[in-house]
Amino acid sequence: MAKDQYPVSDTQSPAKERYFSTFQLILLALFAALVVVAKIALRLPLQLPGHSGIFWMAIMIVAAGVVPKVGATSLVGITSGLIAAFLGMGDFGALNTFLSYTMVGVGTDLALLLLGRKPENLVIAAIAAMFGHFCKFLVKWGMGVLTGAPVGFVALGLARAMIGYVVFGALGGLLGALTLQSLHRAGFFSYLAEKK
């Protein structure tokens, strides 16, 4: 049969639009890398459980504002978890590291979904970040219980560790919301709209 004998449709099926654009995926990958870099480079000499959440959660909230779609922070969490596990970060192995980072993103996404997806709002950002960071605590505690590994924050007391994760998560959320507000004032989002 010759090529000419196959009928060609006049109406091509419309291309299915992807949920995240390539540009948005690149931004989310950069935020994921920034989470890992922040964990390595930005260390506070506080010796308190959960204190790194002030940086993590700020980055997660900014990611949720820059790519305002459900699943954005989950993707940042999964990607940063893969990077961190590959680099051998974390105290209790690759699985614990991957799940911890992933649950930060998933918990933040879930909280933002329930609270109305307004990460630039100080209260919403603080609550969402607090919940996301508390999910990390739950993973670490749960994995410690399941594996019987000595979990450092258990020695400090479970209540103190929980308070640390909640407080530093909320502070990170406030920092992220303030960063988003500054980006709005600077005109970053009108610039970003041109790039989509």
Question: What are these regions, as identified by a protein language model?
Answer:
Residues M1-F20, H184-K196:
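N-terminal juxtamembrane cytosolic/stromal segments of multi-pass membrane proteins
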Residues A2-D4, A15, I26-L30, L99-W141, ...:
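Short helix-perturbing small/polar motifs within transmembrane alpha-helices
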Residues D10-V66, G71:
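Hydrophobic transmembrane alpha-helices
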Residues F20-F31, G53-M57, T73, T97, ...:
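Residue-level signature of transmembrane alpha-helical entry/exit and packing/kink sites
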Residues A32-A41, T79-L87, A129-V139:
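Aromatic-anchored segments of alpha-helical transmembrane domains
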Residues K39-P49, S80-L110, G144-V145:
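Interfacial aromatic-anchored transmembrane helix boundaries in multi-pass membrane proteins
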Residues R117-K196:
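Membrane-embedded alpha-helical hairpins and interfacial helices in multi-pass inner-membrane proteins
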